[in-house]
Amino acid sequence: MSPDSGPEIAVTGNFWLGRGLSSIWSLVKDSISKAESEIQIAAYAIGENSDEYEFFELLRGVLARGIRVLLIVNRFSNQRESVRKILLELASKYSSFVLKDFNPQDKREDLHAKLIVIDHTTALVGSANLSFKGMVANHELMLRLSGRTAYHIGELLDRLSVNSESVKGGPNG
């Protein structure tokens, strides 16, 4: 585990882009492309336009390389049908894709965090949902963190995974 380095900031939105900061989508692509063994993702919402910014293609690419992907989705059954269908297809095609449903009995409780952790060494923490609006159109902010901080965020996702249900329909559910 390397020591913490300073956070890197990425943004979306017309009033924030173009001021020497990376775009969120560029930061996500760059970080995920460097994965060596595992990617953990916590998602509140995955938008219907996700394929427009290549999120599913990015997942397919890392899964084809044999990278383990854990995706914990808030209330999977409430996600758009087209998104659920694609995720179930990925789960059935790739044994290294673990799809989990965070669906607590208390309806006031949600997984609202937007997190991506790569190899327990890099963490992306931000406000953007996995949607066209979140990754491109809205004014959103994301930080890339490393070292102990990223490791601890990965541990939190490990704990959340244990307390989430495997989605029925894939080999892991």
Show which residues each predicted segment covers.
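PLD/PLD-like phosphodiesterase catalytic module centered on the HKD motif
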Residues: 1-29, 34, 38, 47-173
